[in-house]
Amino acid sequence: MTDRARRAFDVEKVTKRFYERFRTELTAFQGFIEGITDMGDRDWYASLMLNRMMFVYFIQKQGFLDGDVDYLRHRLDQLRATGTHGKFQDFYRAFLLRLFHEGLGQPPDQRELELDELLGRVPFLNGGLFDVHDLEQDYPDIEIPDEAFERVFEFFDGYRWHLDERPNREDNEINPDVLGYIFEKYINQKQMGAYYTKEDITGYISRNTVIPFLFTEAKKKCPVAFEPDGGVWGLLRDDPDRY
């Protein structure tokens, strides 16, 4: 077996092992959800929430969420430390939905000022994954206890999340292949006309997280280059595919 074939086999093995545990955790997460009466809708919402959190794990491990590689875990711990729990004051309502809908799902210039204190510096991820979902509109009283997220984070924290395709040196390293694999199992349905590939996922994360982050940091170093007539915009205008 060649090195390339062996690496591909190792990646597939880790991905499949992750997926088997994912199925178990998905079922457990479904059981925590309250406020959705239809079983099919509850299952779909559980899948949506775990898919959202997997995307977040990939970008937080690169430091793109307020510079914190354990962003979700730390925010959960901080909220629980306040002791202000109760209806609509748990992690799901008080923090996570606001992160999804008002943070990742909304451009920074459209956010409320108080949101920065709650979320810190987080990017805008265009594409719809973090928009208010139809299920969230149909079931406005959804509740998910903190214990559900503690369990998911414990599962996710057992893996090392990478955006690139580095050779697996350890058997707990995963890359966006795992998202493509799970989307294929849960989302790629002919009746929906929705198909996701590894390239779609990697490109989405790069376009909406890595590239904007790099431009923001570069602008801090050299603001003049980003003025309307600056060199950066000239390069982008003249040769957008290259730059």
List the model feature ranges, each with a label:
Residues 1-243:
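Preference for the N-terminal adenyl/adenosyl cofactor-binding alpha/beta module
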